């Protein structure tokens, strides 16, 4: 850890004597800078452009070196808007990579990509900073223990359980509920979880970032009265920001999480919403840097960029980072290079389905498409594994029969198939659940369902003990006892 040269005015003045360049070309968020011979900055060095625009407004733009072009020229990407910059402006090489504040003082605060607080609560009380570019932990430092991370969401815990210290992806197109699911996980896990959380808002809506902040203050995850007791640090680089900021804000959040893991030796939760925007920003910058586009117009360095971020999210002997990432799926196409590259890094995938969302089943998690490396008898136990497999078999059979039902109707099915369909429809509805963060929309209080309760509920449906209950009794309830109580209420209403 070291003091960030960009935060100290005296440090900048000494650097000014050292290494000055001038802007030679501006192409949107990308700048070409000429330096004196033999004084070329390194790749990833932070450059500072200071001066005044034509109206006399103060300019302070930080850029990151991406390419050394030869002829004493470097190409850099700006982390903020380049409005007002002109050719010939002075550029200072800070001599180091971009550094951001880390440690306990970051909790309860909102930062931008540069690690500057944007919540109007004054400066951050820390002199400890860390560079955003670091190598992943060495192989020998990694921790390989396997344990389940309970979320209280039935469909996740039963069919695609999350790994403690693992990487989890929430895949879905526009408007199927990725952000709501992430907010529910923050609510369920961050409250019950003893450690700290870091939330990286990468290229998503500013309104959602604001809603999340307000919600965290209401729930006490951020303590307004005593900010030091807060449990979460927020890092935002929203949709309206230049691609440089969106491309690096994930690394800023990750750097803060790494400090809690490596120095404070804590278990950390890292939420990233949305990892696709990280790829998208890289793609925007890539063309401006003069690289030839690859498949579907993405950057040729897609796998490398994704790998350098994802490999740092891991568990070591000191502590763990459990990462939950929302992944936007363009046009609902899971074979698109961005989601396809992300898949390779994950321990569990939660796939959200537009078909289920259209039916009103929330969370709209597809039970057959979602996967987890943790769903093995030696990890979760025989009972959990058997129940999950039977649930999947029943739902798969129902899926196969849907064409026959659509053409011929239910009456043409065999007795056994009709029973399977009835149970599958109950299972489908029982996989829905009222969320704490969606109470405002649904009017139903949120429910947290423990893993043992979840397994018991599905075993009762599969065994046929609840065949007599109407399927609507299983819709948007918590545990199975609530479903039986709801069935009795429905029966009473009929009378």
From Swiss-Prot:
InterPro entries: AAA+_ATPase, ATP-synt_VA_C, ATP_synth_F1_bsu, ATPase_a/bsu_AS, ATPase_alpha/beta_chains, ATPase_F1/V1/A1_a/bsu_N, ATPase_F1/V1/A1_a/bsu_N_sf, ATPase_F1/V1/A1_a/bsu_nucl-bd. It is a peripheral membrane protein. GO terms for molecular function: ATP binding; ATP hydrolysis activity; proton-transporting ATP synthase activity, rotational mechanism. Gene3D superfamilies: 2.40.10.170, Bovine Mitochondrial F1-atpase, Atp Synthase Beta Chain, Chain D, domain 3, P-loop containing nucleotide triphosphate hydrolases. It is found in: Plastid, Chloroplast thylakoid membrane. Pfam families: ATP-synt_ab, ATP-synt_ab_N, ATP-synt_VA_C. It catalyses: ATP + H2O + 4 H(+)(in) = ADP + phosphate + 5 H(+)(out). One of its GO terms (cellular component) is proton-transporting ATP synthase complex. GO terms for biological process: proton motive force-driven mitochondrial ATP synthesis. Keywords: ATP synthesis, ATP-binding, CF(1), Chloroplast, Hydrogen ion transport, Ion transport, Membrane, Nucleotide-binding, Plastid, Thylakoid, Translocase, Transport. F-type ATPases have 2 components, CF(1) - the catalytic core - and CF(0) - the membrane proton channel. CF(1) has five subunits: alpha(3), beta(3), gamma(1), delta(1), epsilon(1). CF(0) has four main subunits: a(1), b(1), b'(1) and c(9-12). NCBIfam families: atpD. Belongs to the ATPase alpha/beta chains family. Produces ATP from ADP in the presence of a proton gradient across the membrane. The catalytic sites are hosted primarily by the beta subunits. This is ATP synthase subunit beta, chloroplastic. It comes from Brimeura amethystina.
């Amino acid at each position: 850890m070291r003091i960030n040269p960009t935060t100290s005015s005296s440090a900048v003045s000494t650097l000014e004597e050292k290494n000055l360049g001038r802007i030679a070309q501006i192409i949107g968020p990308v700048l070409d800078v000429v330096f004196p011979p033999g004084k070329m900055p390194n790749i990833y060095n932070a450059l500072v452009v200071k001066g005044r625009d034509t109206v006399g407004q103060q300019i302070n733009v930080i850029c990151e070196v991406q390419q050394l072009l030869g002829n004493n020229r470097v190409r850099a990407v700006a982390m903020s808007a380049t409005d007002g910059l002109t050719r010939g402006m002075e550029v200072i090489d800070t001599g180091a990579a971009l550094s951001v504040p880390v440690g306990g003082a970051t909790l309860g605060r909102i930062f931008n990509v540069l690690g500057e607080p944007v919540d109007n609560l004054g400066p951050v009380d820390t002199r400890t900073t860390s560079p955003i570019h670091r190598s992943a932990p060495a192989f020998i430092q990694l921790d390989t223990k396997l344990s389940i991370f309970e979320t209280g969401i039935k469909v996740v815990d039963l069919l695609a359980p999350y790994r403690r210290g693992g990487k989890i992806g929430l895949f879905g197109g526009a408007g199927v509920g990725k952000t709501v699911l992430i907010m529910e996980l923050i609510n369920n896990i961050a409250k019950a979880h003893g450690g700290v959380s870091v939330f990286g808002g990468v290229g998503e809506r500013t309104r959602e970032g604001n809603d999340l902040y307000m919600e965290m203050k209401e729930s006490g995850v951020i303590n307004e009265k005593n900010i030091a007791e807060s449990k979460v640090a927020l890092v935002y680089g929203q949709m309206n920001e230049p691609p440089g900021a969106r491309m690096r804000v994930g690394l800023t959040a990750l750097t803060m999480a790494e400090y809690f893991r490596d120095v404070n030796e804590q278990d950390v939760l890292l939420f990233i919403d949305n990892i696709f925007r990280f790829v998208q920003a890289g793609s925007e910058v890539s063309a401006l840097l003069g690289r030839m586009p690859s498949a579907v117009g993405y950057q040729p360095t897609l796998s490398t960029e994704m790998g350098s971020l994802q490999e740092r999210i891991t568990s070591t002997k000191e502590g763990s980072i459990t990462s939950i990432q929302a992944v936007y799926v363009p046009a609902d196409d899971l074979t698109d290079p961005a989601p396809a590259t992300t898949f390779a890094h994950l321990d569990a995938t939660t796939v959200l389905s537009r078909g289920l969302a259209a039916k009103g089943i929330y969370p709209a998690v597809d039970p057959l498409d979602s996967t987890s490396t943790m769903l093995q008898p030696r990890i979760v136990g025989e009972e959990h594994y058997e129940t999950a497999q039977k649930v999947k078999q029943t739902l798969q059979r129902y899926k196969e029969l849907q064409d026959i039902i659509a053409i011929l109707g239910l009456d043409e099915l065999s007795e056994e198939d009709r029973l399977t369909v009835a149970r599958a429809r109950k299972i489908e509805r029982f996989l829905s659940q009222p969320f704490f963060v969606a109470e405002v929309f649904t009017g139903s209080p949120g429910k947290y369902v423990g893993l043992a309760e979840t397994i018991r509920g599905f075993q009762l449906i599969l065994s046929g003990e609840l065949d007599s209950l109407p399927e609507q009794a299983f819709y948007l309830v918590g545990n199975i006892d609530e479903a039986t109580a709801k069935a009795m209420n429905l029966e009473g209403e009929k009378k």
